[in-house]
């Protein structure tokens, strides 16, 4: 008999496999080569899929109807959006490697990486819209809010590099937007699509912020 821990690992492994399947098979087009080649390279970069799995868990926490297959498209959308942030972050940091592979800006160039990141945003929205459950509009609103705040966080990060001192409060605000917000949003979007009540969303938001801060 499997232990509870083993069952949990197997379940999370299944979620990751399903998310991977959607993400790695997302781009069918081959031309323009300079757009789809690097973008496919990003989508095939792997990862733990933490944000995608959190969306599924957020859905499961509030829904008593089991897993709706459409939630995997929302999970994939969050992972693709996360990839966008990494691609653009690598441009801003002049990074040469990520996840044991060259970054797009290193393998190609910064302009190509910029364009690939832009495409990933579009693909993320496209994937989320495939999760056309009754609360999809509210999920899209939350998704967009998270994207804006992630960009704000990245901007604060660059601004703080030019400051002599940064307060703890300022730093915590920056990391909440840059890193924590998408973690929080992953739980919220899953829960929203599962028809969460306001008090459930409030609790998950608080929990998501704590996870995000830990990152």
Where are the language model's segments positioned?
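Long, acidic, intrinsically disordered low-complexity segments
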Residues: 1-21
